[in-house]
């Protein structure tokens, strides 16, 4: 297919030329009714913030320009079908899981998944078969799923309908996806890939394996993260063994009927950009990331991991564009360095946790920006270094799963002070955001270690979300008796 084409963009440009008089929504009427919005966003933007109409197609039932854009995306990603999504990759992940499972079904998955996965299990009332990942002894981060762990889970749960894989994790760690696909398919299970952080795997060279390229059945891809489209835009990819018509039915259960043409056109334009220029763009990103990694490691006390941690299994590969920097030898938590960078140096990184800082590099970064980050980290070491601190060094605590997320979330519950929750079954999520990986999920027993982790995270300034009590002083737990 001709990847230079941008059918949604072309249709919007034609609409502007035709000067159609709008007696439909949105009510700002191409910006004329809201001049402040037009000044802020610009006429070019508000003039194409329009409603679905025949020349522009309909996202819920595409037959013309949106269908053409989806066909081009499928071709670019080497998938059987692609769905343009406007609810973020949360909506892509949830549609993927809901398409693969029915109530009561089991799914094999790592516990270090995004909350959207567990929310989908809660909605469909599926049973999670968690594989607890190993943690790296120095970095404290959770790794990928080991092949033997998945093999044992498949043998113990032959009734499972699917295996879900993070490709990569938030920290850039990749499992042995080709082996997992082969193993799952041999057991007649689908393979679902959360590729929220792996768009570039499809277009760059010297990248980890992309899910569709190794035979996975579905993949949720965050185009807005490393693909250049607008925030909240995403693509759901399916393989030849998946009923795409059924998937669209599932998508339409929750997806808006007022799909934003700003988001849709950004997907169309960005897909073309990746297909035409992706190799060159990501070659430069890799060069910048490798340079930054080397410079940061030369500062001292920081550790930006590289290929030395690859072990052929739990770390089968890693995403070189991710700049994950361990800060513990500095005597500072990752979230503390994150805050200093933002507050003192006007540098916004992706996130900081208890031991690590993540800088997200893309083709939008300039060499001078990378130099500024490296220089700031060096100065932070000089100004704030305090070695010998007693630091919490693990980012993942294996949960004790007591009941399904669905059952726990809808059970009778009561609010209990955090300090008194040990041994109780949690009825809600607790997580740091970003990255949105639950510390606790509904149905998991609260342990003393988890309570200490939550208290420590709050003390270090992590943004904890999920509980009904936004201060996270109390947690909802299952009522006893």
Where are the regions a protein language model picked out?
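N-terminal "arm"/small-domain region of PLP-dependent enzymes with the aminotransferase-like
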Residues: 1-64, 435
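Conserved PLP-enzyme active-site core in the AAT-like
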Residues: 5-13, 17, 37, 61, ...
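Conserved N-terminal alpha-helix of the aminotransferase class I/II PLP-enzyme fold
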Residues: 46-91
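Short glycine-rich or small-residue beta-strand-to-loop segments that form or flank ligand, phosphate
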Residues: 56, 83-85, 163-166, 324, ...
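A short N-terminal beta->alpha junction/helix N-cap motif
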Residues: 57-61, 280, 438-442
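Structural signal for conserved beta-strand scaffold positions within catalytic alpha/beta enzyme cores
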Residues: 84, 130-132, 221, 351, ...
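Conserved C-terminal alpha-helix-loop-beta "cap" of PLP-dependent enzymes
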Residues: 291-467
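Charge-dense polyanion-binding interfaces
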Residues: 463-481
């Amino acid at each position: 297919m001709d990847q230079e084409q941008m059918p949604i963009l072309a249709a919007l440009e034609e609409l502007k030329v035709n000067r159609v008089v709008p007696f439909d929504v949105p009510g700002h009427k191409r910006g004329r009714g809201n001049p402040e919005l037009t000044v802020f966003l610009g006429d070019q933007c508000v003039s194409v913030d329009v409603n679905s109409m025949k020349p522009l197609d309909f996202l819920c039932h595409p037959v013309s320009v949106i269908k053409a854009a989806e066909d081009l995306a499928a071709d670019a990603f080497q998938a059987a079908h692609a769905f343009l999504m406007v609810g973020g990759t949360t909506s892509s992940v949830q549609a993927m899981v809901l398409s693969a499972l029915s109530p009561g079904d089991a799914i094999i998955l790592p516990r270090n998944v995004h909350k959207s996965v567990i929310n989908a299990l809660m909605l469909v009332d599926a049973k999670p078969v968690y594989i607890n990942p190993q943690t790296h002894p120095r970095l404290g981060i959770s790794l990928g799923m080991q092949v033997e762990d998945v093999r044992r889970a498949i043998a113990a749960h032959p009734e499972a309908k699917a295996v879900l894989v993070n490709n990569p994790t938030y920290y850039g760690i990749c499992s042995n996806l080709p082996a997992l696909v082969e193993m799952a398919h041999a057991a007649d299970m689908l393979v679902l890939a959360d590729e929220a952080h792996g768009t570039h795997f499809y277009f760059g060279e010297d990248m980890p394996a992309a899910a569709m390229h190794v035979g996975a059945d579905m993949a949720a891809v965050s185009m807005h993260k490393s693909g250049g489209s607008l925030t909240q835009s995403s693509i759901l990819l399916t393989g030849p063994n998946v009923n795409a018509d059924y998937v669209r039915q599932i998508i339409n259960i929750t997806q808006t009927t007022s799909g934003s043409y700003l988001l849709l056109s950004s997907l169309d334009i960005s897909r073309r950009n990746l297909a035409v220029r992706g190799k060159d763009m990501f070659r430069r990103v890799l060069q910048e990331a490798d340079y930054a990694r080397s410079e940061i490691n030369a500062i001292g006390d920081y550790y930006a991991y590289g290929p030395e941690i690859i072990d052929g299994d739990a770390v089968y590969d890693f995403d070189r564009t991710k700049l994950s920097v361990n800060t513990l030898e500095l005597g500072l938590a990752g979230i503390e360095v994150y805050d200093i960078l933002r507050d003192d140096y006007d540098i916004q990184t992706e996130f900081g946790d208890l031991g690590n800082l993540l800088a997200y590099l893309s083709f939008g970064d300039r060499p001078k920006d990378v130099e500024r980050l490296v220089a700031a980290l060096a100065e932070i070491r000089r100004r704030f270094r305090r070695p010998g601190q007693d630091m919490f060094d693990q980012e993942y605590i294996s949960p004790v799963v007591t009941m399904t997320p669905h059952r726990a979330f809808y059970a009778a519950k009561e609010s209990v002070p955090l300090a008194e929750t040990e041994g109780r079954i949690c009825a809600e999520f607790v997580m740091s955001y970003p990255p949105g990986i639950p510390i606790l999920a509904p149905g998991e027993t609260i342990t003393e270690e988890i309570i200490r982790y939550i208290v420590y995270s709050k003390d270090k300034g992590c943004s904890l979300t999920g509980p009904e009590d936004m201060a996270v002083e109390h947690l909802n737990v299952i009522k006893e008796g």
